[in-house]
């Protein structure tokens, strides 16, 4: 256009050449200048993120100066799996980093470490699948995932890094076991355990989900094995009672309480007819003893085979064998009850009636006494069993104290009146429940007692890739702990690390390692060949981060007192009765022996929801629905992905991933960038509206963030960005202080772009060295408000009025406005003003 107009104005053909040359020079300079200015304002996420990642490495923003209050924010550390990270893994890490950066801006020194849960079944199964030694595959996976975690730009302190396979770490895992052994909390026992035929190892009850192995999903069976156990039951009451101390989700606390399963009741002795034996049962309902019409024993009960009469022996033996092949979970969840009559009877001690003794696999050997008295009229399982096998049903509780004839289903109401119960008839069952336990004790055929569902922890595994259990088996001295000064007991190299399936660990084949001398007597002895479970290291790792190079003690008392416990713990709810329960147990034990001064590891717990693929299906390589973050970071930037991870849905709920959603977040970041870059040099003074909007922004974001409503925080940024863009158009810009405030609020969520814009706005150093903005309630109040004016309930006008206007003035303005628009009210009977809400004029 410039050239064309220049030539049109030139009538001197001789000057055309030089004029053309001049205008081309000027125009090219002008276009280049415009393009340079435009490029300078354009947001280039790759360049910005590269620049600030380098800056943070050279100038750490989270430094302990000894003056700041500590805040310990921790992720559940990952298994170093071979598949690496997908967008679902990012979510928890982004949440913890946002919270950590927020706490930094609030003036804390934030402890935010990362490490690797690298021993155990997940790592070993992957190594076997790939045909690589677990030591090599684990190291490779750690290296790969560490690179991926770096892409998140989280402020992890890698100087605190721990790895459960590092001998300098597992020295202390073994040390804890030795201490537990010396305190009588670690012991050896042979009994039927959950056995995974695929993983070829024993499993704790917590590792069996719906009858299958938590890891490989194979059906779980039973196997008699020598096992090491940890007496977690010794801490049952404290684990239950101390849940009240914790700022944890109610769901998790209930799951732990239910798993511990404390109940009050009575133990009652039933004598076997015609013999010296008696059967001890535990019942929570001693008030229903008159209704106990049969007994059921676990197939593993010590009297199970002995009670079989000659004509029932073959049938009983067969049933016991079949039950031994089922896992506890399968037995409990079986829809159809099975059983066999032993041919023997016991005597009900309350009414001296004979009751048949049955075996059934719905009764477990390790709960209560392994035997139950059955009251089919008032228990659904017993009712179903009695109906199937034609056993007597006697109702002893009814709603009104009257018998209603034959029951169609068990009466299981909590309250009722006793019937068919001798001297107890007419009593309220809830009152009798406590008195009945006392009566049983007074009469000498039982006692009041407390029972727990929680079982001792099966701690040993018949696998290679785990911490060696530091115990020596001596024929003379028995089980002897490896001396503490000889720890760590190193995991030896093996040629074959595959599980044997025989009940022996691969370590059993290394004679030169197994054969040793007893630390007590010096005679020939053998090492324990089972290894610890994957939960051993993860039950205490959070203590080691803060003192990970200490070779003299697990953690120094000085550092423990200064930096522990964990203030915020973030991870999935799937660990509610595994890792979280075990970590509480370990912490209480370490408190009891004086290692730490607190007995709960995690003050606050946040469980993030899962990111799923389409139709809510869990992301997995086998499903082909894994979304890698790498391409998204390349195309949209780390900041955009971080914010979309939060924007996709409420952080505590599962959310379905959709790549298209990140485009909206990317547009927001570009619009925000352009707003700041356009306004930064405008030298606009803050108007009342700018100040009001600034303080309202801070208030809204602060409240949403502290409510952990992170998705609405991101929505709030978008909402206020639009408001400021509109205000900027009206006012010719936005003042620098308001822009700095917005950038600071955004910084925990999108750290790279925030650092760059902070610098563009003239901020000193890093944005993370400033303080989280504050707000003033008075400043953020509106000066004007919109009041709808109604006539007989229908809106006719809207007035913009001062927030302090009085009723009479507002009513007058409303009438005048109605006159102006031709909607006057002739016969007014009532004038209503709801302050700050509405005016309604009622007329005939």
What are these regions (language model features)?
Residues 96, 109, 301-400, 405-406, ...:
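Catalytic alpha/beta core of large soluble enzyme barrels
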Residues 42, 50-51, 55-59, 129-287, ...:
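Residue patterns forming the tRNA-binding/recognition surfaces of aminoacyl-tRNA synthetases
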Residues 117, 182-196, 448-477, 534, ...:
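Helix-rich, typically C-terminal accessory recognition domains appended to large enzymatic cores
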Residues 65-132, 138, 161-176, 199, ...:
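N-terminal catalytic cores of NTP/NDP-binding nucleotidyl/phosphoryl-transfer enzymes
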Residues 39-74, 104-113, 137-144, 319-358, ...:
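Conserved oxyanion/phosphate-binding beta-strand-loop segments in alpha/beta enzyme cores
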Residues 9, 13, 24-59, 63-70, ...:
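Basic, alpha-helical terminal appendages of large translation-related enzymes
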Residues 233, 238-261, 298-340, 487-512, ...:
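Amphipathic alpha-helical
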Residues 344-350, 354-367, 396, 514-651:
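Alpha-helical recognition segments enriched in aromatics with Gly/Pro capping
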């Amino acid at each position: 256009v410039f050239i064309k107009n220049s030539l049109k104005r030139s009538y001197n053909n001789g000057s055309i050449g030089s004029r053309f040359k001049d205008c081309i020079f000027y125009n090219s300079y002008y276009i280049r200048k415009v393009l340079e200015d435009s490029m300078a304002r354009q947001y280039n996420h790759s360049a910005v993120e590269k620049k600030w990642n380098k800056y943070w490495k050279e100038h750490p923003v989270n430094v302990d100066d000894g003056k700041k209050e500590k805040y310990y924010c921790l992720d559940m550390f990952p298994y170093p799996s071979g598949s690496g990270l997908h967008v679902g893994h990012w979510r928890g890490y982004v949440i913890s980093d946002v919270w950590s950066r927020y706490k930094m801006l609030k003036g804390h020194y934030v402890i935010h470490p990362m490490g690797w849960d690298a021993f155990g079944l997940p790592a070993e199964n992957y190594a076997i699948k790939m045909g690589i030694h677990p030591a090599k595959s684990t190291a490779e996976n750690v290296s790969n995932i560490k690179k991926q975690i770096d892409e998140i730009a989280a402020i992890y302190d890698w100087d605190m890094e721990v790895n459960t396979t590092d001998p300098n770490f597992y020295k202390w895992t073994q040390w804890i076991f030795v201490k537990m052994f010396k305190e009588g909390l670690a012991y050896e026992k042979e009994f039927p355990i959950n056995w995974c035929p695929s993983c070829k190892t024993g499993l704790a009850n917590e590792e069996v989900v719906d009858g299958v192995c938590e890891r490989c999903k194979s059906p779980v069976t039973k196997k008699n094995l020598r096992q090491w156990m940890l007496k977690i039951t010794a801490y049952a009451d404290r684990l239950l009672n101390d849940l009240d101390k914790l700022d944890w989700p109610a769901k998790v606390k209930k799951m732990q309480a239910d798993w511990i399963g404390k109940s009050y009741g009575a133990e009652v002795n039933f004598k076997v007819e015609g013999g010296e034996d008696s059967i001890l049962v535990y019942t929570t309902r001693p008030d229903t003893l008159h209704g106990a019409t049969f007994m059921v024993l676990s197939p593993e009960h010590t009297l199970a085979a002995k009670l079989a009469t000659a004509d029932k022996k073959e049938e009983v033996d067969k049933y016991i064998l079949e039950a031994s092949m089922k896992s506890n979970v399968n037995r409990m969840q079986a829809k159809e009850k099975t059983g066999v009559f032993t041919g023997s009877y016991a005597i009900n001690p309350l009414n001296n009636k004979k009751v048949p003794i049955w075996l059934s696999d719905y009764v477990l050997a390790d709960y209560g006494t392994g035997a139950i008295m059955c009251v089919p009229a008032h228990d659904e399982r017993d009712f179903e069993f009695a109906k199937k096998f034609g056993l007597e049903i006697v109702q002893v509780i009814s709603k009104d104290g009257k018998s209603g004839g034959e029951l169609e289903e068990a009466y299981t109401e909590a309250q009722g009146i006793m019937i068919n119960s001798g001297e107890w008839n007419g009593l309220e069952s809830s009152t009798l429940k406590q008195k009945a336990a006392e009566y049983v004790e007074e009469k000498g055929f039982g006692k009041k007692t407390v029972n727990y569902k929680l079982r001792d922890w099966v701690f040993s595994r018949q696998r290679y890739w785990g911490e060696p259990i530091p115990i020596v088996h001596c024929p003379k001295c028995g089980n002897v702990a490896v001396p503490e000064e000889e720890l760590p007991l190193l995991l030896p190299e093996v040629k074959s690390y595959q599980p044997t399936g025989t009940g022996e660990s691969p370590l059993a084949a290394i004679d030169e390692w197994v054969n040793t001398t007893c630390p007590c007597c010096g005679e020939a002895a053998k090492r324990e060949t089972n290894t610890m479970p994957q939960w051993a290291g993860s039950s205490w790792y959070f203590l080691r981060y803060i003192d990970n190079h200490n070779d003299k003690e697990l953690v120094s008392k000085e550092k423990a007192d200064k930096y522990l416990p964990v203030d915020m713990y973030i991870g999935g709810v799937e660990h509610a009765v595994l890792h979280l329960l075990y970590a509480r147990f370990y912490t209480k034990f370490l408190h009891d022996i004086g290692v730490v001064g607190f007995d709960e590891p995690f003050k606050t717990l946040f469980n993030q929801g899962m990111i799923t693929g389409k139709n809510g299906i869990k992301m997995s390589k086998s499903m082909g629905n894994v979304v890698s973050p790498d391409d998204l970071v390349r195309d949209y930037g780390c900041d955009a992905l971080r914010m979309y991870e939060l924007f996709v849905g409420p952080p505590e709920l599962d959310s379905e991933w959709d790549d298209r959603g990140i485009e909206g977040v990317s547009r927001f970041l570009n619009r925000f960038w352009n707003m700041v870059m356009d306004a930064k040099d405008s030298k606009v003074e803050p108007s009342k509206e700018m100040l009001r909007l600034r303080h309202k922004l801070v208030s809204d974001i602060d409240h949403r963030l502290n409510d952990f409503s992170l998705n609405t925080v991101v929505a709030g940024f978008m909402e206020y960005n639009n408001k400021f863009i509109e205000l900027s158009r009206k006012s010719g810009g936005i003042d620098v202080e308001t822009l700095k405030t917005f950038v600071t609020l955004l910084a925990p969520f999108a750290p790279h772009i925030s650092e760059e814009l902070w610098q563009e706005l003239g901020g000193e150093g890093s944005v993370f060295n400033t303080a989280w903005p504050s707000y003033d309630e008075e400043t953020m109040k509106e000066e004007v408000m919109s009041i709808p004016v109604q006539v007989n309930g229908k809106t006719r006008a809207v007035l913009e009025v001062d927030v302090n206007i009085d009723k009479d003035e507002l009513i007058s303005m409303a009438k005048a406005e109605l006159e102006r628009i031709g909607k006057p009210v002739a016969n007014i009977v009532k004038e209503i003003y709801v302050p700050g809400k509405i005016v309604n004029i009622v007329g005939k």
